[in-house]
Structures are given as C-alpha cells and as structure tokens.
Regions:
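N-terminal targeting leaders of exported, membrane, and organelle-targeted proteins
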Residues: 1-11, 99
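Conserved N-terminal glycine/acidic-rich loop preference
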Residues: 8-9, 51-53
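Metalloprotease/metallohydrolase-associated module, dominated by Zn2+-dependent proteases
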Residues: 10-14, 18-40, 44-48, 62-71, ...
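Short, surface-exposed loop/helix-turn segments at secondary-structure junctions
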Residues: 54-64
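Short alpha-helix carrying the canonical HExxH Zn2+-binding catalytic motif
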Residues: 85-102
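Glycine-rich, acidic and aromatic/proline-enriched surface loops and short helix-turn segments
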Residues: 103-107
C-alpha cells in the first residue's frame, strides 16, 4: 500500500508542478524558524479543492473520517496544497511547512507509516505528528521565542516520544 500511496503522491505533485510556488516568499515572515534554503525547496499550490487520494486508498488506510471532512490543506512531501481561504492564512502555511520538515526528517516510508499508525491509535486531533505541527504553529502565532523548526522537529522525532507536545520539551528552547 505504501508504494501505491507514493505513486499517487508523485503523480499529484507532477500534475501540479507548473503551479507550485516556492515558499521563499515567506522568508522574512518565517526568518529564524525556517532557513531560506529549506523554503526554496518547499512549495505550495493554491487549488479550488485539496487533492485527495482515491477513495479506495482512503478506505484501505482507515482514513474515511479524516478525508470525509472539509480539508483546507494537505502536505505531500515537499509540496502542500491549500484552498483559497487557507492560502491567505499564514498560520496554515507555517503548519504545513512543519509537515514538510517531518517528511524530510522521516523520509517518505517512515512518514506515511507513522502518520497512518498514529491516526489509527490516537485519532487526528491527538496524533503526535499533528500535535507537533499545531504546537509549533501556535508558538509562531503567539510570538513566542523563535525556534529552528527543523531542529525542533528532528529533536522531537529522535526522542521518539509519543507525547511530542512542546510543553513537555522545554529543553528544546
């Protein structure tokens, strides 16, 4: 199934390749959080509807509940997809860039495997990969101390802690 998902991710990113915009347009806003070199290799696409995997993949992976709801954004490797209303929300861009960093740190197979496992165990709202992204985007919005997101993601993933909440990882600051 991972190979099937990988094919869909690659095909989707290829289909939208000419519409991708580099995230370097956020370099001033996200200075200190993401290096410009990372932003230059991260992309987003504004789409009327976020591309979703074929229904048979969704059902097979047990993600009916996740993709049954309205999806404002979805990260596929180095590219994330946003609806027009989400594209104007800086916090959502930040959140999706955390997922790009997670993809890079874990690699394709480990990211997908972990995401599927976490969502089946914890559900979307409590799964560690999403909590990590939500905690980091909340810190950004609150104007808290700037942290290097890639290093923070790396540290949290290396800890391999099921509770990746930044509140329990104050040593990262």
């Amino acid at each position: 199934m991972l190979d099937t998902i990988r094919s869909w991710v690659n095909e989707t990113n290829l289909h939208f390749a000419t519409s991708r915009r580099p995230c370097t347009e956020f370099k001033e806003l996200f200075a200190g959080y993401f290096p410009e070199s990372f932003l230059a290799r991260s992309y987003y696409v504004e789409v009327p509807e976020v591309p979703l995997p074929p229904l048979e993949y969704v059902s097979q992976a047990g993600l009916d509940d996740l993709f049954g709801q309205s999806v404002a954004g979805l990260t596929l490797d180095d590219t994330y997809y946003l609806t027009p209303s989400a594209a104007n929300n800086l916090r959502i861009h930040f959140h999706e860039l955390v997922h790009v960093a997670q993809w890079q740190q874990l690699g394709y197979r480990n990211f997908i495997s972990r995401y599927l496992e976490e969502i089946s165990i914890y559900g979307y709202d409590q799964m560690p990969l999403e909590r990590m992204a939500y905690d980091l985007d909340a810190r950004f919005v609150a104007g808290g101390p700037v942290v290097d997101v890639r290093q923070t993601v790396r540290k949290l993933l290396e800890d391999n802690d099921t509770d990746v909440s930044l509140r329990s990882h104050e040593e990262i600051e």
